[in-house]
Amino acid sequence: MKAIFITLEGPDGSGKTTVGTLLNQKMEEAGIDFIKTREPGGSPISEKVRNIVLGIGNEEMDPKTEVLLIAGARRQHVVETIRPALAAGKTVLCDRFMDSSLAYQGAGRDMDMEQVLQVNLYAIEDTIPDRTYYLDVPAEVGLARIAANKGREVNRLDKEDISYHEKVQAGYEKIIKMFPDRFMRVDATMQPEEITEVILADILQQLS
């Protein structure tokens, strides 16, 4: 069985974390040799950067600083975690990657998405996902889910208003048009178990 690089993307409240946990279990049951990781983070240095980028109290962070910090964390994640796993024949399942920067920092912060893309391509070089699952949910539904989930860790981006999250969603639509071959859109208004089964079926097909 070949190894591939898989990413989960979607706006806040799309259920990525829940689906990622279920998918982790289902992939183990299917006998897939893989690692599960996340961004920002995924390596010791990158996790430290995550705390800075998402930390409450850092609301004054300049948008370009945000882009560069996340790209730096991504570089370390690629070098320390993702590439070694792929080289060892392990599939990589990652909660967010480059596309999140294009959507959240590029579109969400009204920055030039092409510039954000080039910064990230410099960081990751040829380590580009083979398959990206976009969990599609309306911005207002996602924010309502966040508000209802009292146990969820609140980060700096959660405090943005709905207009920011709508721009993020519009950004994702542009990204899907930029990279149509690797994206699969999944209706995230379905139950997490249903979403997981849809994604797992496609993963098994990609690995065959």
Curated annotation (Swiss-Prot):
Superkingdom, natural source: Bacteria
Reaction(s) this enzyme catalyzes, per UniProt: dTMP + ATP = dTDP + ADP
Protein name, entry field: Thymidylate kinase
GO cellular component, one term: cytosol
Residues forming coiled coils: none
Alphabetical keyword list: ATP-binding, Kinase, Nucleotide biosynthesis, Nucleotide-binding, Transferase
Residues bound to ATP: 10-17
HAMAP family reported for this sequence: Thymidylate_kinase (MF_00165)
NCBIfam families in UniProt: DTMP_kinase
Family per similarity comment: Belongs to the thymidylate kinase family.
Function: Phosphorylation of dTMP to form dTDP in both de novo and salvage pathways of dTTP synthesis.
One annotated GO biological process: dUDP biosynthetic process
Enzyme class: transferase
Keyword rRNA-binding tagged: no
EC number: 2.7.4.9
An MF annotation (GO) of this entry: dTMP kinase activity
Gene3D superfamilies recorded: P-loop containing nucleotide triphosphate hydrolases (3.40.50.300)
Encoding gene, per UniProt annotation: tmk
